[in-house]
């Protein structure tokens, strides 16, 4: 997914982040789950599910032609994306979900066809938003589902493999670990004590996510043959797989553990172009590591997310 340019408000938000008083060893840090967050519901009949919906991992998607407003197949594939979300919602309801919030987490954040979604869900749309692809998550949720996800920029396989921006980002590391969108977003959920329970996408994305965050349910809807090629299920078959894996995930929801990163979090962000790195280095608490990499230390994943929102809001069109 790609972020639109939205520096102004978020830069001022970033300036409000205070530098840590003393450097800490990550191994000695504390859990990112904060006591100030709202308590999760203990009601036996309440089951809240958060869905983060990306597009590159949707059935049949292989190139730009399907994933952006300029693509000749985009309108059709918006329909497939929406249908995958609906398949997940349907199965989640059948398995006992009482509340569902969806974050449209691809491109301009306005991909899902709202008129085709059921009227008993809520939807987060468009940018900017400080928690990015996870906007709306909090400790009241019981589980998170990633739909239409893809492999990371560090993975040599996977359809449309990238991390946050295929146009600008070459690496994202937290405390020395290479991160994918799935792992960053899982850490966002883990901050609030909420586990990821299922992921859908190509075989590479599903396997990568399971290696990083654990044995979550995986709905494989296509098999990567290259960056722009795949062997894919047909839409109706993909919806069946998503329904099946969603039901399985909710049936074993108590088995999953939140993916929690200990603080402080040292983010190293490597970009393709030198100019955004230079500009980011002007901000407080940001260190330029080399011509293409900056380092930022955040006290929790929310601070990291705010910084990423600023950094990835840079427009590639402004490159020299």
Question: Each PLM stretch: what is its role?
Answer:
Residues 7-16:
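Bacterial N-terminal signal peptides
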Residues 19-23:
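Boundary at the C-terminal end of the N-terminal hydrophobic targeting segment
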Residues 41-64:
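Mature N-terminal segment immediately following signal peptide/propeptide cleavage
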Residues 67-87:
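Short catalytic helix/loop segments, enriched in acidic residues and glycine
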Residues 100, 238-320:
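C-terminal accessory domains and tails appended to enzymatic cores
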Residues 119-137:
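A glycine-rich helix N-cap at a beta->alpha junction
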Residues 166-192, 201-204:
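Active-site glycine-rich loop that binds ribose-phosphate moieties when present
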Residues 188-196, 200-247:
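Active-site rim beta-loop-alpha module in soluble metabolic enzymes
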């Amino acid at each position: 997914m790609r972020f639109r340019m939205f520096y102004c408000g978020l830069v001022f938000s970033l300036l409000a982040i205070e530098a840590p008083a003393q450097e800490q060893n990550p191994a000695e840090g504390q859990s990112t789950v904060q006591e100030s967050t709202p308590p999760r519901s203990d009601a036996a009949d309440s089951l809240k599910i958060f869905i983060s919906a990306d597009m590159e991992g949707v059935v049949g998607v292989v190139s730009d032609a399907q994933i952006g407003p300029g693509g000749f197949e985009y309108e059709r594939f918006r329909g497939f994306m929406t249908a995958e979300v609906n398949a997940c919602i349907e199965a989640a309801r059948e398995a006992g979900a009482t509340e569902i919030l969806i974050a449209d987490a691809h491109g301009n954040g306005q991909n899902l066809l709202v008129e085709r979604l059921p009227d008993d869900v809520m939807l987060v749309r468009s940018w900017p938003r400080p928690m990015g692809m996870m906007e709306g998550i909090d400790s009241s949720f019981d589980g998170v589902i990633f739909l239409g996800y893809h492999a990371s920029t560090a993975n040599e396989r996977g359809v449309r493999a990238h991390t946050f921006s295929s146009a600008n980002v070459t690496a994202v590391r937290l405390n020395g670990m290479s991160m994918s969108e799935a792992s960053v977003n899982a850490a966002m959920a883990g901050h609030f004590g909420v586990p990821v329970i299922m992921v859908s996408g190509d075989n590479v994305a599903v396997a990568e996510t399971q290696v990083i965050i654990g044995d979550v349910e995986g709905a494989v809807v296509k098999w990567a043959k290259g960056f722009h090629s795949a062997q894919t299920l047909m839409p109706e078959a993909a919806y069946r797989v998503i329904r099946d894996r969603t039901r399985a995930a909710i049936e074993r929801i108590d088995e999953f553990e939140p993916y929690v990163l200990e603080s402080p979090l040292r983010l190293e962000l490597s970009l393709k172009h030198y100019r955004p790195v230079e500009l980011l280095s002007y901000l407080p608490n940001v260190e330029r590591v080399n011509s293409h990499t900056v380092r930022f230390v955040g006290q929790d994943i929310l601070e990291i997310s705010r910084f990423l929102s600023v950094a990835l809001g840079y427009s590639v069109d402004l490159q020299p």
